[in-house]
Amino acid sequence: MDIEQVMQYLPHRYPFLLVDKVTELELGKRITAVKNVTINEPFFNGHFPGAPVMPGVLILEAMAQAAGILSFKTKNYSPEQIGIIYFAGIDGARFKKPVKPGDQLVLKAEIVREVRGIWKYTGRAEVDGALVAEAELMATLRDKP
């Protein structure tokens, strides 16, 4: 999926759209997506001047956005049809290495289960094949108003 297709499944827009493309998708199982991290990201102005590092919370948000695409595609819905999938919880978040300008952040999410509209996933973020962050994520669908 290219950026135009990604934008059909995520309501986020610049500067909070954190998925640039989807490289692998297995419906009902897993997704691999990419965020190209550039020095032009607005958060680098303050995190940290002279030693820019992508905030860990945004790495988690990028994983959650990839997981949201997986859920929408698995159910064959879009946000315009049914609503938005909200990030609802996180467990066991671990940050292993910093993500810096110029890195290509590879986002991986796998569905653990979906029960009564609550999705649980495992998420990983990698740079150059090395683990930089991991977490268990939860999300839920909020109906369209």
Curated annotation (Swiss-Prot):
Principal localisation: cytoplasm
Enzyme class: lyase
Highest taxon of the lineage: Bacteria
Residue intervals passing through the bilayer: none
GO molecular function term, any single one: (3R)-hydroxyacyl-[acyl-carrier-protein] dehydratase activity
Compartment(s) where it occurs, according to its Swiss-Prot or TrEMBL record: Cytoplasm
Gene Ontology CC terms: cytoplasm; membrane
Biological process, per Gene Ontology: fatty acid biosynthetic process; lipid A biosynthetic process
SUPFAM superfamilies for the chain: Thioesterase/thiol ester dehydrase-isomerase (SSF54637)
Catalysed reaction equations from the record: a (3R)-hydroxyacyl-[ACP] = a (2E)-enoyl-[ACP] + H2O
Keywords for the protein's UniProt record, in alphabetical order: Cytoplasm, Lipid A biosynthesis, Lipid biosynthesis, Lipid metabolism, Lyase
Pfam families with a match to the protein in the record: FabA
Catalytic residues in the record: H47
EC number(s) given by UniProt: 4.2.1.59
Protein purpose: Involved in unsaturated fatty acids biosynthesis. Catalyzes the dehydration of short chain beta-hydroxyacyl-ACPs and long chain saturated and unsaturated beta-hydroxyacyl-ACPs.
Family per record: Belongs to the thioester dehydratase family. FabZ subfamily.
Protein name (Swiss-Prot/TrEMBL): 3-hydroxyacyl-[acyl-carrier-protein] dehydratase FabZ
Organism from which the protein derives: Thiobacillus denitrificans (strain ATCC 25259 / T1)
Lineage: Bacteria, Pseudomonadati, Pseudomonadota, Betaproteobacteria, Nitrosomonadales
Gene: fabZ
